[in-house]
Amino acid sequence: MRRAEVQRTTLETMINVEFTMDGNGEFSGTSGLGFFDHMLTLFCKFGGFNLNLSCQGDLEVDDHHTVEDIGLVLGEAFSKALGDKKGIARFASGFYPMDEALMLIAVDISGRPYLAFEADFPPVLAGKFNYQMVEEFLRGFVQKAGITLHVREISGKNLHHKAEAIFKGLGRTLKVAVSVQGDELPSTKGVI
C-alpha cells in the first residue's frame, strides 16, 4: 500500500498528515480554515486519496503559514507514499470546468519541483482563507512532492469556482499520473 505519515513542527505550525495514495477519496481532520478544508476534500475525492490532517497554526496572524506548511507536509507525504515510482504513468493533464471557470492542469512526476501558475486570484477572503494562498499551497506541495505542475486559467470569474476547478483537477490529474501501468521506471535516464 502506498502510504506515508509526515509531521512538521515549527514556531508557527504543528502539522501531522497521514496520506494514502490508493484510498477511497476521504478527507478527515481540519486545517482550521473551512474553505481550505473544502478544497482538500475535493482534492482527495477526485484523486482517490485518503488524507487525515491534524493542524495547529498561527491563524491569529493570518492563513499563510498554515496553508503553505500544509502544502509542504502533504507534498512530502505524497513523495514518500509514491515510493520508487516504478511503473507509474508519470505524465497527465486535463481541462477541468466548474461552471464558467476552466483550468488546464498538467503534471510531470519528474523529481524536478517547478510550478507554473497562471491564474488570477486577488487578495480576497473566503471566510479566513485568502484566495492568494491557492498558489502558495501549490508551491509548497510541488517543492516537497518533487513534481512539475502547470496551472493555467482558461476562463473564469467566480473565485470559488476557479479554486474548485484547480483542486478537483489537481486530484484527478495526479490520480492518472500515479497510476501503475507497468513495472519499469518511466525515464530514459533511469532515475526520477
Curated annotation (Swiss-Prot):
Enzyme category, top tier: lyase
Reactions catalysed: D-erythro-1-(imidazol-4-yl)glycerol 3-phosphate = 3-(imidazol-4-yl)-2-oxopropyl phosphate + H2O
Pfam families per UniProt: IGPD (PF00475)
A GO biological process held by the record: L-histidine biosynthetic process
Disulfide bonds: none
A GO cellular component annotation in the UniProt record: cytoplasm
EC code(s) of this entry: 4.2.1.19
UniProt cross-references to InterPro entries, sorted A to Z: IGPD_sf, ImidazoleglycerolP_deHydtase, ImidazoleglycerP_deHydtase_CS, Ribosomal_Su5_D2-typ_SF
Pathway recorded for this protein: Amino-acid biosynthesis; L-histidine biosynthesis; L-histidine from 5-phospho-alpha-D-ribose 1-diphosphate: step 6/9
Molecular function GO labels: imidazoleglycerol-phosphate dehydratase activity
Subcellular location: Cytoplasm
Keywords: Amino-acid biosynthesis, Cytoplasm, Histidine biosynthesis, Lyase
NCBIfam families named in the record: PRK00951.2-1 (NF002111), PRK00951.2-4 (NF002114)
Family per record: Belongs to the imidazoleglycerol-phosphate dehydratase family.
Name of the protein described by the UniProt record: Imidazoleglycerol-phosphate dehydratase
Gene: hisB
